[in-house]
Amino acid sequence: MSKPICSTGLRWLWLVVVVLVLDFASKQWILGNFVLGQSQPLIPSFNLFYARNYGAAFSFLADHGGWQRWFFAGIAVAIVAVLLVMMYRSSAQQKLNNIAYAFIIGGALGNLFDRLWHGFVVDFIDFYVGNWHYPTFNLADSFICVGAAMIVLEGFLSPANKSAKSKGE
């Protein structure tokens, strides 16, 4: 027997749309206002810097001839499918997990769109200290990392806290 969608974690899918809109808008702004390699300092240790990532996190496999585009696209589709099933199986009251899943789905879909449309992922957030620069990333990457951190955090909650959170107390 099927469950009403609003009683499942799918109730939180609106967050996926929020993540996608923020990610898409930020990348479109970069594409419309920056040339590849252009940097704009905002505050000390933080620049906007337009980069193209043909690989995964930290440009993993970026220089491997193009097959990685489809490989990482397939991984993104699989992750989205698994997380959608997990959201459907969870209660809408399990806020922390469902928000985390929505953040990861939104980020994965944002980067998937880039891979399929452009052939690369648009990165633009550049943190640095002195001459050392953290690898450039984007909002989708940020939402994926925050979602993953939320899942880890949820794993550390005591069983009493978990039951209180699921009941909305």
UniProtKB/Swiss-Prot annotation:
Keywords: Aspartyl protease, Cell inner membrane, Cell membrane, Hydrolase, Membrane, Protease, Transmembrane, Transmembrane helix. It is an enzyme of class 3 (hydrolase). Its EC number is 3.4.23.36. Pathway: Protein modification; lipoprotein biosynthesis (signal peptide cleavage). It holds the Pfam family Peptidase_A8. It comes from Serratia proteamaculans (strain 568). This is Lipoprotein signal peptidase. Belongs to the peptidase A8 family.
